[in-house]
Amino acid sequence: MSVLTNPSLLLLRNSEELKGKSILVVNFVQDGFLNELKTLNPQSKITAFSYNHANGEFAKNISGINVEVNHTINAGEYDLVILYYPKSKPELLMALDNIRAVISKEAELLVVGENKSGVKSIEKQLANKTAFSNKIDSAKHCVLYSFSEITLNSTFDISTYHKEFMVNVSDIEFTAVSIPGVFNHGGLDAGTKMLLENAPNIKHGNVLDFGCGAGLIATFLGLKNPALTFTCSDVSALAAYATTQTLKLNNVNGEAVLSDGLNSIAGKFDLIISNPPFHTGIATDYTVAESFLNNAKQHLTKTGKLTIVANSFLKYPPILEAQFDSYQTGFKNNKFAVYSS
């Protein structure tokens, strides 16, 4: 059995609450909770839903669990929903609206999270949407809440959460589409802006936009050089959806794919370009970016190039030195640096 996280331990010490015929677990983590939940409910239908492809791949190895990784939770008439509180408040509010469109009228909603995640705001966030709320338990710096007699939504349409914004860099202007939970939600960040200003001017070929967010990098390069073809990868189904919308809106030739790091990426590229992520959930996590840098070379053509932007304090140059014959620092200030192989 996998080690249990503190939110999962809190859930399991209230195992009498974890009973249902059709159970939905949203934003689950990579631990042993789903196994334990199946043991408690051997005859029940259990669906594990995540926006995160890596979590979905983890859960696929658990017997008796239906796994869904998507940008939208599908209808299921669930009578018990267990929600792990996410790091993004806009993502939470969108997920709650989605949940209220897929549950039965008798459903109970359990919400668990670490204190530092902001979970203590959940009662206010569900005000006027449930008749009963109860703080069931708190321990290990976590809190567990229960909600019942929930006001249902007749439908859920993710397009109502689209947020469009303008990007204008180096005489290239376009409209981007984002949704809650996506990096670049609502605007162009300073690091990506610097990357675009210093991106190589490749005229044709295949480009991988790694950790694509809302698809800003691919769209910028595609509008600058329309002969390019893009593969845009992200671990987030929300990001893949947003990127698809942005590419389509701007008639850029590319596709969005779900991948845990480079695991699902096939073929070789003339350019790999990225503002690599260094957070997992609410925690700092360098493993994804470091694994990406250690393995990017095998996905490049013989003359292919890697270009990234990173916070200046991150220790990426030693990895670049080890993996490539040479690399250049294209631009650097006290906040960011652009590196190219």
Role assignments for model-derived ranges:
Residues 70-76, 263-267:
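Short amphipathic alpha-helix with an adjacent loop that forms part of the alpha/beta core around
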Residues 78-84, 269-277, 307:
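Short SAM/SAH-binding signature in class I
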Residues 4, 140-206:
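SAM-dependent Rossmann-like transferase core, predominantly class I methyltransferases
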Residues 69-71, 257-260, 310:
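Short loop/edge segments at beta-strand edges and connector loops
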Residues 88, 279:
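Active-site beta-alpha loop architecture of Rossmann-like, nucleotide-cofactor-dependent enzymes
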